[in-house]
Amino acid sequence: MVAFDANEALTPCREGRGIGAILFDRERLRQAEVGLFSPQHWGSKARPVGEGGRGSAWFIDAPFGASVLRHYLRGGLAAKISHDQYLWRGSDRTRSFAEFRLMRALREKKLPVPRPIAAYYMREGLRYRAAILMERIEGVRSLADRALVAGRGAPWEETGRLIARFHRAGLDHADLNAHNILFDGNGHGWLIDFDRGVIRIPATAWRERNLKRLLRSLIKLRGERSVEDVQKDYARLRRAYDMAWNRGT
């Protein structure tokens, strides 16, 4: 867990029978309230994010800047039991607070990630719901989109070097897929979606697990491209990753 600092503010909140809290960046928000985490609150200023995810994210045109709101939803078999509720294990272990603080820690390491603005949870009994609000990186396209459009011309080497940089800092990304890697027109890259991610001592096992997950997503999202073409492009990514890792950059 990242230590609390002077730029964080924490305020309690209530919603119906729920009791919760909001963790926010005091440099971006003077105060925070539950409405920040509702797309209905923003009205026409909220637009659904179309790519990736489970329909749980919105672009927000907020007075404090272009932002992204994301609700935490469960996937797989767990979603059949409850699509948006998680077992309560304490505020510091909520998905939203953990991701907020992880993103802040990555930014402190000078890594290219969105700035977290606010995170909240709402608890009822032994269950809670959560959401996070972060800055939007504008003028970018995902690796998934770039691969479909540009194929071999997509930023494969840049992606390999970008991932190596995060791995060198100890980031074990829980969902490293082609939707969560973004590039702008100048070739600058970012990673997004750090839910369930952790900072740990760099080790081969989890680094390889991240990379294999990315390859699976590239194959799944390949469109009309052949698996062989995707594997060739991934080989370029992997060579660049290995070179950057071995150089310590």
Swiss-Prot record:
List of catalytic residues: D175
The UniProt record lists the keyword Thylakoid: no
Record-linked Gene3D superfamilies: Transferase(Phosphotransferase) domain 1
SUPFAM superfamilies: Protein kinase-like (PK-like)
EC primary class: transferase
Gene Ontology molecular-function annotations: ATP binding; protein kinase activity
Taxonomy, superkingdom: Bacteria
EC number(s) stated in the UniProt entry for this protein: 2.7.1.166
Membrane topology label: Peripheral membrane protein
Compartment list: Cell inner membrane
GO biological process: lipopolysaccharide core region biosynthetic process; maturation of SSU-rRNA
Biological or metabolic pathway of the protein: Bacterial outer membrane biogenesis; LPS core biosynthesis
A cellular-component GO term for this protein: plasma membrane
One Pfam family per UniProt: Kdo
Catalysed reactions, semicolon-separated: an alpha-Kdo-(2->6)-lipid IVA + ATP = a 4-O-phospho-alpha-Kdo-(2->6)-lipid IVA + ADP + H(+)
Keywords: ATP-binding, Cell inner membrane, Cell membrane, Kinase, Lipopolysaccharide biosynthesis, Membrane, Nucleotide-binding, Transferase
Classification via HAMAP family: KDO_kinase
Function: Catalyzes the ATP-dependent phosphorylation of the 3-deoxy-D-manno-octulosonic acid (Kdo) residue in Kdo-lipid IV(A) at the 4-OH position.
PANTHER family with a match to the protein in the record: SER/THR-PROTEIN KINASE RIO2, SERINE_THREONINE-PROTEIN KINASE RIO2
Family membership: Belongs to the protein kinase superfamily. KdkA/RfaP family.
Protein name: 3-deoxy-D-manno-octulosonic acid kinase
